């Protein structure tokens, strides 16, 4: 185009072509003028390219005494693989990192002041955060000094504290145990005021009484809460106890009181939550005091996550009436740790059933809750979606799906629920899919499959959604098809086909691989198992199950696969098998209490749940759970009595 006599031309491929060539030059070491030394690894690059991407490197290059020579930059605290990821990004604008490497990429981006990359990595970590990992994510965010990331993690912890309290990371945290004696007819104040007084007491114990935080955590501490709302030290109830005052007093005290120089031991909250040395790499800012989240778990029993003098820890607090009506003598503390939940505050009861009986449903864990969607009963395919809270043993409804659907599977991808394919009970198999947005409690259509698909397996792997196998339009034989959905491009593409046709198979992810288990080729049940490697796009047959089955469910627990129930060609079955990938072996486990075919199976926390299904006579709405320690299934649950 030549406006006003000037030639105007825009080459749409120039930038992409040029950056690809630049990256090739970097990898071959041509025209490079900077050497990065990263923990003994040497990397060559071009100063001009790196200076455009990294303000940190720009400052270094700009201060070079010889701007025309070779620059040398040394890093002893970065992961070489992470730096290589950032170099590729600098040359291609594409950020590609294995999930295990994202934290290191974040750290390197922070060092190099690549804020956009740091934010993208932080958002990725948040999308993968759950109740099992949020504590380590908080330690990481605190160590990095990222207030945005830290605030989002803290908000998640506040919402899911009770679920988090059952996880291994929580149990490893250092803990402060408090027994608060109450005068007659006196109740503890609200969480906020209560823990402000507790923090005040901890500070005074450390800086005025000379205690260390580690010493305070070694045994249960006895405090006394009087009728005039004063918190007294239970060990000094002879009238010499210090009264801990208002919030203003607390703030002034923190500002004015300098750290004591003494020989007391220090502790820190490591990434695993264990006690560690003062120079541990993961520690909150020194002298930070903060209540992160708290819950009243029962009458006068409180649970709290807090930062005490920079240490992320747990505070257990139990209030009980004192045998004395006034602090004239020290109350005696039971060695049974009565600050913890008492046995009579736990009740065992049959698990609440779903509102609807359903078979061929989709199930998944999301935010510590069990989601059960769709399915069919004797009358119809369902649109309804139910959500189970394990801590209250209560089912509630979420927004219904747009389309009635059964004989499908559901998966969580980047924090969102996806349902794909299935049958609506009236027409041919479905090609449509939906995504549940919890922010608006509604389902949003996703791009359709290229072919209709029923009885297929669905699973999330490496940030993408896979749909595997399924039945043909006539429902008479299985398929080998495998397709993958990219939530960024919104496109479905094909990947390597299965070795064996199969439908009604169980599908899940474990250790970076995708597993498809059992199913049927036509109507003959299979015991064969295939494993997909996304690195080389191949399916491999591995050890077969002991029992051929279709319509089974699968869940992951402690790094192993548990395949539950199904149909063996004659009957609905209750048997369960466990696969150990390190041994490539299957082992029979404890049976479910009821036969279940086409049931929903999912892991929530450290528990496997089985919901719904068909027992050979009835469509089920019942629930049962698996206890790994006892190798038993039970239709009962224990919940706190409020």
Curated annotation (Swiss-Prot):
Q: Where is this region: Disordered?
A: 257-281
UniProt signal peptide: none
Which part of the chain is the BACK domain? 132-350
What GO molecular-function term can you cite, just one?
ubiquitin-like ligase-substrate adaptor activity
**Keyword flag Metal-binding:** no
Q: Where are the Kelch repeats?
A: 384-421, 432-469, 481-518, 527-565, 575-612, 622-642
Query: Source organism's superkingdom?
Result: Eukaryota
Segment Sufficient for AHR interaction and signaling: which positions?
A: 164-368
Per the record, residues carrying Phosphoserine are 246, 277, 322, 336, 338
User: Which Gene Ontology terms of cellular component type are present?
Assistant: Cul3-RING ubiquitin ligase complex; cytoplasm; cytoskeleton; cytosol; nucleoplasm; spliceosomal complex; transcription regulator complex
Q: Where is the BTB domain?
A: 1-131
GO BP: intrinsic apoptotic signaling pathway; mRNA processing; negative regulation of intrinsic apoptotic signaling pathway; negative regulation of protein ubiquitination; proteasome-mediated ubiquitin-dependent protein catabolic process; response to virus; RNA splicing; transcription by RNA polymerase III
InterPro entries associated with the record: BACK (IPR011705), BTB-kelch_protein (IPR017096), BTB/POZ_dom (IPR000210), Kelch-typ_b-propeller (IPR015915), Kelch_1 (IPR006652), SKP1/BTB/POZ_sf (IPR011333)
- Compartment list: Cytoplasm; Cytoplasm, Cytoskeleton; Nucleus, Nucleoplasm
Q: Where is the composition biased (Polar residues)?
A: 265-281
Q: Which Pfam families match?
A: BACK, BTB, Kelch_1, Kelch_KLHDC2_KLHL20_DRC7
- Which SMART domains is this protein grouped with? BACK, BTB, Kelch
The record's domain comment reads: When the BTB domain is lacking, AHR signaling induction promoted by IVNS1ABP is massively increased; Thus, the BTB domain inhibits AHR signaling induced by IVNS1ABP. Dimerization is necessary for proper splicing activity of IVNS1ABP and this is mediated by the BTB domain. The BACK domain is necessary for proper viral M mRNA export.
Q: How does it assemble?
A: Homodimer; through the BTB domain. Interacts with AHR/Aryl hydrocarbon receptor. Interacts (via BACK domain) with pre-mRNA-binding protein HNRNPK; the interaction is direct. Interacts (via BACK domain) with splicing factor PTBP1; the interaction is direct. Interacts (via Kelch repeats) with RNA polymerase POLR2A (via C-terminal domain). Interacts (via BACK domain) with splicing factor SNRPA; the interaction is indirect. Interacts (via Kelch repeats) with splicing factor SART1. Interacts (via BACK domain) with ALYREF; the interaction is indirect and likely plays a role in mRNA nuclear export. (Microbial infection) Interacts (via BACK domain) with influenza A virus non-structural protein 1 (NS1); the interaction is direct and bridges the interaction between NS1 and HNRNPK.
Task: Say what the protein does.
Answer: Involved in many cell functions, including pre-mRNA splicing, the aryl hydrocarbon receptor (AHR) pathway, F-actin organization and protein ubiquitination. Plays a role in the dynamic organization of the actin skeleton as a stabilizer of actin filaments by association with F-actin through Kelch repeats. Protects cells from cell death induced by actin destabilization. Functions as modifier of the AHR/Aryl hydrocarbon receptor pathway increasing the concentration of AHR available to activate transcription. (Microbial infection) Involved in the alternative splicing of influenza A virus M1 mRNA through interaction with HNRNPK, thereby facilitating the generation of viral M2 protein. The BTB and Kelch domains are required for splicing activity. Promotes export of viral M mRNA and RNP via its interaction with mRNA export factor ALYREF.
The UniProt family comment states: Belongs to the BTB-kelch protein family.
Which pathological condition is tied to this protein? Answer: Immunodeficiency 70: A primary immunodeficiency clinically characterized by human papillomavirus-associated warts on the hands, feet and face, recurrent bacterial infections, and autoinflammatory features, such as colitis, celiac disease, and retinal vasculitis. Immunologic workup shows decreased CD4+ T cells, decreased CD19+ B cells, and hypogammaglobulinemia. IMD70 inheritance is autosomal dominant with incomplete penetrance.
Q: What is this protein called?
A: Influenza virus NS1A-binding protein
- Give the organism the record lists: Homo sapiens
Name of the gene: IVNS1ABP
């Amino acid at each position: 185009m030549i406006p006003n006599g000037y030639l105007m031309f825009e080459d749409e491929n120039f930038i992409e072509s040029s950056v690809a060539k630049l990256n090739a030059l970097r990898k071959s070491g041509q025209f490079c003028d900077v050497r990065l030394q990263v923990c003994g690894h040497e990397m060559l690059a071009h100063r001009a390219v790196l200076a455009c991407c990294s303000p940190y490197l720009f400052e270094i290059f700009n201060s070079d005494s010889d701007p025309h020579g070779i620059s040398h930059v040394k890093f002893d605290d970065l992961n070489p693989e992470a730096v290589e990821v950032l170099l590729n990004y600098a040359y291609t604008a594409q950020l590609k990192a294995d999930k295990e490497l994202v934290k290191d990429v974040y750290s390197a981006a922070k060092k190099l002041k690549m804020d956009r990359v740091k934010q993208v990595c932080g958002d990725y970590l948040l999308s993968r955060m759950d109740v099992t990992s949020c504590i380590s994510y908080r330690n990481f965010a605190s160590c990095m000094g990222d207030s945005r990331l830290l605030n989002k993690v803290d908000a998640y912890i506040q919402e899911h504290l009770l679920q988090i309290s059952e996880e291994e990371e929580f149990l490893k945290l250092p803990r402060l145990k408090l027994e608060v004696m109450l005068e007659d007819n006196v109740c503890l104040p609200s969480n906020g005021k209560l823990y402000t007084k507790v923090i005040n007491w901890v500070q005074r114990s450390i800086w005025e009484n000379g205690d260390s935080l580690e010493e305070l955590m070694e045994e249960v501490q006895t405090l006394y809460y009087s009728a005039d709302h004063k918190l007294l030290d239970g060990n000094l109830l002879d009238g010499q106890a210090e009264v801990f005052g208002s919030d203003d007093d607390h703030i002034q005290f923190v500002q004015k009181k300098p750290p004591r120089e003494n020989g007391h031991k220090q502790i820190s909250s490591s990434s695993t939550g264990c006690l560690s040395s003062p120079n541990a790499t993961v520690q909150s800012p020194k002298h930070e005091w903060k209540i992160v989240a708290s819950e009243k778990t029962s009458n006068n029993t409180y649970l709290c996550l807090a930062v005490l003098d920079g240490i992320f820890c747990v505070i257990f607090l139990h209030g009980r009436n004192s045998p004395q009506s006034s602090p004239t003598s020290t109350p005696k503390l039971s060695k049974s740790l009565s600050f913890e939940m008492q046995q009579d505050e736990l009740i065992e009861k049959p698990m609440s059933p779903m509102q609807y009986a359903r078979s061929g449903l989709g199930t998944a864990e999301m935010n510590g809750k069990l989601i059960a969607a769709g399915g069919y009963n004797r009358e119809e395919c369902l649109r309804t979606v139910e959500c189970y809270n394990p801590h209250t043993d209560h089912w509630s409804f979420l927004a219904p799906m747009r389309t009635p659907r059964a004989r499908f599977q559901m998966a969580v991808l980047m924090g969102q629920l996806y349902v794909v394919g299935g049958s609506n009970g009236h027409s041919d198999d479905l090609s449509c899919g939906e995504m549940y947005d919890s922010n608006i409690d509604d389902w949003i259509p996703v791009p359709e499959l290229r072919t209709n698909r029923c009885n297929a397996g669905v699973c999330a792997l490496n940030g993408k959604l896979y749909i595997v196998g399924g039945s043909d339009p006539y429902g008479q034989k299985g398929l080998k098809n495998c397709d993958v959905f990219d939530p960024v491009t919104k496109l479905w593409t094909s990947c390597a086909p299965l070795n064996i046709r199969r439908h009604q198979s169980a599908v899940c992810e474990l250790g970076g691989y995708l597993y498809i288990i059992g199913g049927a080729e036509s109507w003959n049940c299979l015991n064969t198992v295939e494993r997909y490697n996304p690195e080389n796009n191949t399916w491999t047959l591995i050890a077969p199950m002991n029992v051929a089955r279709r319509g089974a469910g699968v869940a992951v627990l402690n790094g192993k696969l548990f395949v539950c129930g199904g149909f063996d060609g004659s009957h609905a079955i209750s048997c369960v098998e466990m696969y150990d990938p390190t041994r490539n072996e299957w082992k029979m486990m404890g049976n479910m209490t009821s036969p279940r075919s086409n049931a929903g199976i999912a892991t929530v926390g450290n528990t496997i749940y089985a919901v719904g299904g068909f027992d050979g006579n009835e469509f089920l709405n019942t629930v049962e759970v698996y206890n790994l320690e006892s190798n038993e299934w039970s239709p009962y649950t224990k919940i706190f009595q409020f």
